[in-house]
Amino acid sequence: MPEEGVEKFYHRDILSFEEISRVLRITRELGINKFRFTGGEPLLRKGVFDFFEALPSGDYNITTALAIEGLDIDRINRLKFAALNISCDSLKPDKYRYITRCGDLSVFLSNLKRVRVDNLKINVVVIKDFNEDEIVDFIDFAGEHRATVRFIEKMDFAAGEPEFSSLTEIKKQLVENGIINPESFRINNSVSEYHSLIKGDGNVGFITPITRHFCQDCSKIRLKANGELKLCVFAGDNYNLRDILRSEPDDDVVKKWLHDIIQFKPFEPVIKKNLETMAEIGG
């Protein structure tokens, strides 16, 4: 996140909960049945728990930093979503404060201690010369919290961002040090490549969009808070779904528009520089 923050939107510029619900309904009819709510921090939005609790049954998960003081953890536990993904890039207070710009590690740890969900994942973006020395700490930390840790290569979109740290070398070191098994596997067509721990029952995941891209297996599309549709996080093209939703009352017309746009999703690398940062895209 840039120190100055990101561009702020007027309330009218972002999708309402009713519009999001409409998108979920229409995309289900197109065969899309797995949804993840991310950010930024989705739990900051006023009324979001009421929205989550009113959703029809389905395969939902949330990505959150769990960094909000006074966060209603009991309400999170009652959601019974398919998974809860937690973002945390350092377990050291000073580094945590730096990477979050203002976060307090003790708040995160206090919130995490109260989480009671069946499928808990901790996502760690590995940043060169920043948190590479915390890999084993995160593996141990995840085990203590009955979670699966997933290491993610930093996606370097904009000029001036820190270089990513290749997970290929990190995996090699973990295998050589007897921490993970060399054989890899995938779970439910996930883009994550998992290795089981040699000691213990857990798994360690690796998401490698740079060194070993998975474009041919990716079925994700992203809908930003302002209603822009991204078919690929690396691509520069955005499609304005918000205006279609607000100008077209017929769900079938919106469904056809979505169907036609989704056909343009790339299944090979289209990495471009000087695009939006992940802080702007979300996720």
Label the model's feature ranges.
Residues M1-L15, L30, C232-V233:
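Canonical Radical SAM [4Fe-4S] cluster-binding loop centered on the CxxxCxxC motif
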Residues D94-K113, D118-G205, P209:
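Radical SAM enzyme [4Fe-4S]-AdoMet core and its adjacent flexible, acidic
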Residues K34-R36, D59-T63, A83-N85, N119-K121, ...:
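Structural preference for beta-strand elements that scaffold enzyme active sites
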Residues F157-Q173, I179-V270:
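Accessory C-terminal segments flanking Radical SAM cores
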Residues K34, E41, I261-G283:
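Short flanking/linker segments adjacent to small metal-binding domains or redox-active Cys/His motifs
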Residues I20-G31, R114:
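A short, N-terminal amphipathic alpha-helix
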